Amino acid sequence: MGIKKYKPTSAARRLMTVSDFADITKDSPEKSLTEPLKRSGGRNVHGHITRRHQGGGHKRRYRVIDFKRRDKDGVPAKVVAVEYDPNRTANIALLHYADGEKRYILAPVGLSVGDTVFAGEGADIRPGNSLPLQNIPVGTVIHNVELKPGRGAQVIRSAGTSGQLMAKEDRYAQVRMPSGTVRKVLIECRATVGQVGNIEHEIIRIGKAGKSRWLGIRPTVRGLAMNPVDHPHGGGEGKSGQGNPHPVSPWGKKTKGLTTRTNKRTDKFIVSGRRQGARSQ
C-alpha cells in the first residue's frame, strides 16, 4: 500500500498524506460480522470525562475480529477480501472457511486475495497462519500474540508491528516485542506468523485539525495555556513558566520522564526492558 500526496492548494493540503488504499479490495463490510458501536465520548456513567481528548468523529460499526481461531484448527480458509477497518490501524482480511463460516482476521504483510490460511499445530510457517508458540521455529517474525492460552491475541496488533520468537525454555517462550522488551510467554499461547500489514500507517501526516476531529480526536490544550483553576501549570502574566519543580498532570501527579509501567505482578515475565528511546507499544 502506498502513500498519496496532494497538490498544495491550501496550507493543510501542502503536507497532508493519505493511504492510497491499493490493497483494499472491498468497500463495504460483511454485514453479518459487524455490530453497532455505541460511543461514550470519553465519559463514564455519571457523565464525567474519564478519558480526555476523545469524542465526535464519524459514525462507525464494529467489525468482529477473530483473535482466537482455536475452534478452526485444520479447517482451510480462503482470503476473499482485504478491507479497511475504521476501528484500528491495521487492515482486516475476510476469510471464507471450508465449513461455510465467514470471519475476519488482521491482514498481515504478504497476505492477498486467493491465499489459503490455516490454524492449528500442523499449520505451515506462512503469513496468516496461527500456531502455538511451541510449534513456531525460533527466529520467526510473529504478531497477534496471546498472553494467556485461549484468551485470544492481546499484543502486537497495530499496523506495521511485529515481534520475534527469540528462544524457548521449559514452559515459556521468549518473545521480543515491538518496544524491544523481551517477554516470557507460555508456549501454549498462540501467535500468527508474519508482520501486521498497512506498514505505511506511521508515516501518514494528518495535515489539519479537522481531520483529527473526523477520527474522534479532540484538541489537546497545554496546561500552561489554562487558568490556575483548571491546571497546576496555569495562570501568570504573559508567557510565564509553569512554576513547578517538575511538570505535573491536571491532578497534580508528576508526569514526563517517569516510567509508566506499574504492573509489578508481571515483572517476573520481563526478561529485558525496552530499548532506550523506543516508543511504548
From Swiss-Prot:
Residues in the signal sequence: none
Annotated protein name in UniProt: Large ribosomal subunit protein uL2
NCBIfam families documented for this protein: rplB_bact (TIGR01171)
Region of interest: Disordered: 27-59, 225-281
Segments of skewed composition (Basic and acidic residues): 27-38
Superkingdom classification of source: Bacteria
Chain's role: One of the primary rRNA binding proteins. Required for association of the 30S and 50S subunits to form the 70S ribosome, for tRNA binding and peptide bond formation. It has been suggested to have peptidyltransferase activity; this is somewhat controversial. Makes several contacts with the 16S rRNA in the 70S ribosome.
UniProt KW Repeat keyword: no
Subunit structure: Part of the 50S ribosomal subunit. Forms a bridge to the 30S subunit in the 70S ribosome.
GO biological process: cytoplasmic translation
Keyword Ribosomal protein: yes
UniProt cross-references to Pfam families, sorted A to Z: Ribosomal_L2 (PF00181), Ribosomal_L2_C (PF03947)
Listed InterPro entries: NA-bd_OB-fold, Rib_uL2_dom2, Ribosomal_uL2, Ribosomal_uL2_bac/org-type, Ribosomal_uL2_C, Ribosomal_uL2_dom3, Ribosomal_uL2_RNA-bd_dom, Translation_prot_SH3-like_sf
Any single Gene Ontology cellular-component annotation: large ribosomal subunit
Species name: Myxococcus xanthus (strain DK1622)
GO molecular function terms listed in the Swiss-Prot or TrEMBL record: rRNA binding; structural constituent of ribosome; transferase activity
UniProt entry keywords in alphabetical sequence: Ribonucleoprotein, Ribosomal protein, RNA-binding, rRNA-binding
Family from the record: Belongs to the universal ribosomal protein uL2 family.
